[in-house]
Amino acid sequence: MNSSPVRRSALLAVGTVATLVTALCVWALGVQPEGPDDPDPWDRTLGGNPFRLASTALAPTASCDALLDSYRERALELVGPWGWEGQEYYFDGPTPLRGDAAADTASGTTARARTSRAESSETGTNVQESGVDEPDTVKTDSQHLFRLHGSQLTTYDVSGAAPVELARLRLPDLQTGEMLLHDDRLVVIGAGRGNDPTTKIITIDVSEAAAPQITETRSVTAAPVTARLHDDVVRVVVRNGLPELDFRHPDDRRGEVGARRHNERLVAATTLADWLPHIDGESAVDCAAVAVPEDPDTELGTLTTLAFTPGDDQHRAVAVATETEIAYFSGNRLHLATAPSWSWGPPARTTSSLIRSPGNGHTQLYSFELDGLDTTFIAAGEVKGAIADRWSMDSADGVLRVALGRTLATGNFNSVVTLDEQDGRLVERGRVDKLGIDEEIKSVRWFDDLALVVTFREMDPLYAIDLSQPSEPKLLGELKIPGFSQYLHPLGPERMIGIGQAAEPDGTTTGAQAALFNVSDLTNLRRTDVVTYPERTQAGAATDPRQFTWLPEQRTALTVLTDNWDGRTTWVSALKVRGSKLQEKRTAVAYGADASLVRLVPLSSGKVVLVTDDEVSFFDVD
């Protein structure tokens, strides 16, 4: 870590050191420091101190003034004569390194690890974790269907022979969003209208589906990231980037030195209102609930998690003074990961945004325990490599498992690493390296004692990794086949479907494909059948798993398919599993550019609702 002890103490702002340093900087710039707009809220944190287990890697500051000083100090390093400035531009993600090393394979012919079946949530959404519902544009209670299209909510009765529209409700100031459903309340989370990043949280009473009523609206001055529903608790993650300031650029009247000094004065005069989110004019998070990372390379911004129960106007909040969009929720954990640093083009000259610095090829991890409305910091750590997205993380029995892609800090391979929570730190417990030499991770699926990882460059290695002993993860087997799977869906202990792209032997992709795998023997993985779709097609589940639906009673998978490389037709591909084979039937369901809106929602009656841009109808699976 390129940080001296003085630098660390300044970033953590423990005591008065950071306050003094920033005050001197502000004084030198000719600007009087301003405190927070609100009275010091140090003792107002609901639910106790969320950082009572804070470590040196992530800790709250000593006061609101110290928190503001830490923001200002870090921001002054990012400002220049053109405003917020980036560094020299290059990609610090997967890098085409070369090597001949091979992964070690575990010996033995049997394994404890097994796959298990994944099903849609009770509200009809294909989710990552069982029991943790995810937002979507369509939700159901099996009697009614609720659809959000832009700012319009439409309710339907789906208990009869055909869906019947019941009501429409316009949601004011909402540009686009998604929903969570709990009992008779919908919670809509989405982007508000206007130029400034805003998250709208709208609660709607749908106890009378024919007359939905808005019961509460919250406006958060931050951009939406994601949301989850745990039992009756909604958690919404929002982010604040670098603030919009009235920066000046060099011109005939002002040179670079003058522009830089002007811009530095603006940064030094920022208040907490510029860095922290507000809800309807009030501070959304207390100073005591905001922690500052130790790592000086961490992106500057604020990531806030809001927790509340639908119908209750109170919330609890916790925040980390960084910016990322990678958030993974398990049943009792929230894990945040910083994104790999990357950029391209000429040096950045922006008024505001996420500025990606060159970084060091490491990923920072922050783990929180979820208990009711409380979101409590548990541990933080650092790993070498890049975490692509939330699907690259998993949590089981207090162990965080991550799939890591290549960066400048790693070898020319991918890895699976397990980490323990120990005294506020995430400590590496075990690892498997040398997965996919010179290849990129395309998909990951986790189970209690197993990870399935797909990498690709010219061939598609599918790796099975035994995680039953977190301190000694083992590579059980691998399968190399053309093409690759971008989404893996387990059907049970013996079968798995992969949705992705077919490819030529040289790695050139040709079109979408669906593959059926036999995973009953993890030391001998087999692809038993493959459906290859027409050239230049794409499968929606490859980028949005909510466009995949598994119907266990019918032994049928439904996936959305488009020809949007050069056309505008959307199909539903019904894949019936018959032993080791796939029987495919394709139905054109929509035309136009809105293929991403198509959903296939299973009902408890056995029917499936097809939602397109134009209509809502029942889909004939047979």
Residue ranges and their predicted role:
Residues 2-622:
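Beta-sheet-rich non-transmembrane sensory/scaffold domains
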